[in-house]
């Protein structure tokens, strides 16, 4: 079912766009942007106070995975990131063991394959 988000702030730096408008979503993708779009057969969401923007990138994330997963792990960290609009993140190497070898990096990236955000690593 299509979804119409009315009166959300739409930000798209690539288009120089920053204004309140309606978004029509079809199959999970933006099909149309505009003002006063018709709601025909669409679920209506009132977007006042909401922001629609490209996914954000967090360049400094402590996933603590491996070794300190009682604080955070790939899945909880990515879930929290996605809830805040972050679609990509850079994981710091402060883990136990330290993420300082190809093996530990590969292991983290393998676990991240099914996470809610794209994970990259730093050293």
Where are these regions (language model features)?
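A glycine-rich helix N-cap at a beta->alpha junction
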Residues: 110-123
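Active-site metal-binding motif and surrounding structural segment of the metallo-beta-lactamase
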Residues: 37-52
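Divalent metal-coordination and catalytic microenvironments
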Residues: 8, 23, 28, 49, ...
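N-terminal metal-binding scaffold of metallo-dependent hydrolase/deaminase domains
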Residues: 1-39
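General beta-strand structural signal in soluble alpha/beta enzymes
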Residues: 45-46, 91, 121
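Acidic active-site catalytic centers that drive phospho-/nucleotidyl reactions
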Residues: 12, 22, 46, 54, ...
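Metal-associated gating/positioning segment near the N- to mid-region
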Residues: 50-113
